[in-house]
Amino acid sequence: MDRVLLSSQLSSQTVVNTRVQQGSGGINSIGFAVIRKGSLKLRCYAIGGLGGGENLNDPLKESNNGPVLQGFNGSSASFRTVGAKITQETGDFFVSDAEGDPDKPTDGFSSIDEAIGALHEGKFVIAVDDESGDNEGDLVMAATLADPESIAFMIRNGSGIISVGMKEEDLTRLMIPMMSPIAEIEDISAAASTVTVDARVGISTGVSAADRAKTIFTLASPDSKPTDLRRPGHIFPLKYRNGGVLKRAGHTEASVDLVALAGLRPVSVLSTVINPVDGSMAGMPVLKQMALEHDIPIVSIADLIRYRRKREKLVELIAVSRLPTKWGLFRAYCYQSKLDGTEHIAVAKGDIGDGEDVLVRVHSECLTGDILGSARCDCGNQLDLAMQLIDKAGRGVLVYLRGHEGRGIGLGQKLRAYNLQDDGHDTVQANVELGLAVDSREYGIGAQILRDMGVRTMRLMTNNPAKFVGLKGYGLAVVGRVPVISPITKENQRYLETKRTKMGHVYGSDLPGNVPEEFLNPDDIAGDQDEDDTHN
């Protein structure tokens, strides 16, 4: 049986209770709660690998990397991880208001319909990619309605860089190539930049508001030809990814989607809003002040995703079958993406019913780990453990997303990255050395599959916080996180540690709610009652 080491310097009114279990099939789990004054402050679970053996390091090691829980000095523990903290979750990782009205805007934001109306009239909209304001906000307008005055406003209040969101067919027609020489491998998390352009006629240097408006008009016109543009220039076209915000929750996609919803030609103008005081990207206070002063609707990209998701469906269920597996009996669902034709599979156990509190794993394709049993990663072990846990729970869904090989770089590039790792690079450095994205996966298709299968709230099996964010806006809520901790081997030890230190992977699970009985003992309860009586 596994043990947990808690060497803590906690206040006398803080109680840490633990529970250790060894389940069938070699699945081990540990749970513990932190209780202050009878109130649950944190409840964590860690789930072990698929049995012991020589391939495991010592099940528990004292960590030199700090406390078990953030803010608790002197605590140290590791549950089959490489000196890893069991990291406390924050509210930022939880998606609330799962159902509600998809057309109802987030508090403090304008509705999508208001934004659509403003764009149709040639006015501005501010699009924000995170309701907390941690990320940027962009001024957006329709390219077909841009004029020198509006471009001058964008220059005064933005970064000075004026971009134009365009669909691939228009970029191809105008022979505008991508800026990156590796056009076939794109970082979906970043804007897809092309070479810069100016209009060939009707401008002077190309830098004035009037000149830039002329270039934008040329880009937006369906009658323009490649010879109408010169390269480089002062306008920055950005390639819109097919599927828009349902494929990538970025400003380019949001701006083009909004303009198209306004019934206009799908070409947008956008520029990042800058804080006039220090030149940094404007946060929510600055963005909302600008919106108030200039009567500009301000919208959340998450709201736009909800708006589109209510009206569109980008996956199609094409087959369902009974699927007996080594883990148990499941149902297999094959979904085809309407964006690129890729077939994805989901397996389900039990009755999803009302879709509440479903155990879910969204798993990225890894041929080397899942099929060939590669020891370089933990993918195969995580898949195995997730299927076991769903079978044991009797109810759950695993979505297997194709096209995620090597965190989105593809099989061949992943093998090249392996060679670099053998030469001393870690998994992040290897991708960077190849000129590739560290992680270009997106989870919108997986979210739509879950919605179609009836899932509404879930306990998500993951160590990766990006999956929480990737589900936002699809009418799904994450009510808890179940970590998927797999055996450490000599081959994957550095890989797992790099994911923790450089990619933000976390361990442990913060589940809000009342204190469960299994974490309490009579002394705790009596002490709490005595304290309450004193205050009464």
Swiss-Prot record:
Pathway: Cofactor biosynthesis; riboflavin biosynthesis; 5-amino-6-(D-ribitylamino)uracil from GTP: step 1/4. Its EC number is 3.5.4.25. GO terms for cellular component: chloroplast; cytosol. It is found in: Plastid, Chloroplast. Coiled coil: none annotated. It holds the Pfam family GTP_cyclohydro2. InterPro entries: DHBP_synth_RibB-like_a/b_dom (IPR017945), DHBP_synthase_RibB (IPR000422), GTP_cyclohydro_II (IPR032677), RibA (IPR000926), RibA-like_sf (IPR036144), Riboflavin_synth_RibBA (IPR016299). It catalyses: GTP + 4 H2O = 2,5-diamino-6-hydroxy-4-(5-phosphoribosylamino)-pyrimidine + formate + 2 phosphate + 3 H(+). Zn(2+) binds at C366, C377, C379. Residues 525-536 have a biased composition (Acidic residues). The active site is at D439 (proton acceptor), R441 (nucleophile). Involved in riboflavin biosynthesis. Catalyzes the conversion of GTP to 2,5-diamino-6-ribosylamino-4(3H)-pyrimidinone 5'-phosphate (DARP), formate and pyrophosphate. This is Probable monofunctional riboflavin biosynthesis protein RIBA 3, chloroplastic. It comes from Oryza sativa subsp. japonica (Rice). The gene is RIBA3.
